[in-house]
From Swiss-Prot:
It comes from the Bacteria. CDD domains: Ribosomal_S15p_S13e. The keyword Metal-binding does not apply. The gene is rpsO. This is Small ribosomal subunit protein uS15. GO terms for cellular component: cytosolic small ribosomal subunit. Residues 1-24 are annotated as: Disordered. Part of the 30S ribosomal subunit. Forms a bridge to the 50S subunit in the 70S ribosome, contacting the 23S rRNA. Residues 1-21 have a biased composition (Basic and acidic residues). GO terms for molecular function: rRNA binding; structural constituent of ribosome.
Length: 89
């Protein structure tokens, strides 16, 4: 499952530091969070989709790595992002 181009553009505008920002950790984590939420909804109706579940776990691991990187580089930005996305940690 992927997110629409409009959804991705909205996330980039909301979490980006400047116009066209696609590479900052905040934007990457926000896009991954959106994809994870979409897949989570998918698995509520498709419980036996184990191949897709593996992809979900890879996305969660990638998001975790990016969050760890951001925490090591700038604790304040990390805390701000966690609060804005509503992630627990």
């Amino acid at each position: 499952m992927s997110i629409t181009t409009e959804e991705k553009a909205r996330v980039m505008k909301e979490y980006g530091t400047k116009d066209g920002d696609t590479g900052s950790p905040e934007v990457q984590v926000a896009i991954l969070s959106s994809r994870i939420a979409t897949l989570t909804e998918h698995f509520k109706t498709h419980k036996k989709d184990n191949h897709g579940r593996r992809g979900l776990l890879k996305l969660v691991a990638q998001r975790r790595k990016l969050l760890d990187y951001l925490k090591a580089k700038d604790e304040a930005r990390y805390q701000s992002l966690i609060e804005r996305l509503g992630l627990r940690r």
